[in-house]
Amino acid sequence: MASLLSVENVTKQFGGLTALTDVALHVDQGEIVGVIGPNGAGKTTLFNIITGLYSPTKGRIFLNGKEITNLPPHKIAALGFGRTFQNIRLFAKMSVLDNVLVAMHSKTKSSLFDAIFHTPRARREDKQCLARAEELLRLVDLWEERYEYASSLPYGKQRRLEIARALALDLSLLLLDEPAAGMNEQETQELLEIVRKLKQMNTTILLIEHDMKFVMNICERIYVLDYGRVIADGTPKEISSNQAVIDAYLGLAEDE
């Protein structure tokens, strides 16, 4: 069976700088896969290529067996990609609930006419979107805060709201870019429980993360990047005992 996501020998150059060299990875349906490595290893560049923000210098990317290399970001998102970023991107002066509803806009079918005259079709879609948004806020434990401004939420809850916004796209693959960055221990544990819920729902996740405890607890497989190359891949147990990984990254991560 073909992988849900397949990255085949991707190289990315910026002028004379090579950010990625022959990177290959795959993610199967329902898996949680991690990408780790030192700062500057090329992790976010890889995510940017997968989601269409960058074009690879060479290599190919497939989703469900269909090539998506060089498709624009909005077309890739429409195929079922949801993504969070290192820097939180929310509508600060909108409510938590409205932040999720806005994220659903690209999936609605109502026309401008429907919206202006509030036709039965528009009312039906509004009702469906509201029900889905409320479901997602319960999933990420933000139901009680649904009418609060996004900017009023503590950092950890803003991260969870960003995940809810990504999930609003009815995605086939969720990409999380350092979801636990900047969180305290309690916030990280709460996030871990939410990701476990997503796993139980058969959500497929590819994530970048520096918190090794988080990665080892939630990922089924891990790829390790160093200087733009995959130097190892395997289960958490295999990665934690790989001497090349320890030398390149894990020893540094433990010191931080």
Language-model region placement:
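Glycine-rich phosphate-binding loops of nucleotide-dependent enzymes
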Residues: 2-256
